[in-house]
Amino acid sequence: MLFMMPSLEDRANSGLEMAMEGVESYLSLGIPKNKLVLGLPWYGYRYTCIQYFQNNNTCVIEKVEFQGAPCSDAAGRQFTYAYIKNLMNEKNITQVWENDTATPYYNYEDPSVSDGTIQMRYDNPHSLKIKIDYAMNLGLLGAGMWNANSLDPSDSAYAILQRAEMWGVMP
């Protein structure tokens, strides 16, 4: 799963370049393309910015290691896609698109944290489709997600649309 690669960045945990790097590393080991499935998250990470630079939208996060390796996931907290979208709607937050990782994110203010800025990093149907298209065009066996219960299970029109959009991009 590409999103489990160690890093200490306040960036997407499953950016396009990371997907490409991960796939290439398996291919360089001689793993056949038709045996690989690209794993993608249906969740995201919430990071508390210990310092936030608005001029270049950089969120400096706490330096945390996991099993001896730098790990941004350990510095953040995982949230479901349903939670991420609900918070975005509830607080009327505008999503930002990061071109070099092909992923969305957003910032919001929380007065209970040191700098006050929280950054939420996640994938949405558009970013997932870009990565899935990459996998399929490369000739991989497929793409999968973790995990299906990250979506809103209710019968609301919004939840039904959310599920249709997310499942709609899967191969």
Regions found by a protein language model. Name each.
Residues 18-21, 127, 159:
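Acidic, Ser/Thr-rich intrinsically disordered and amphipathic helical segments
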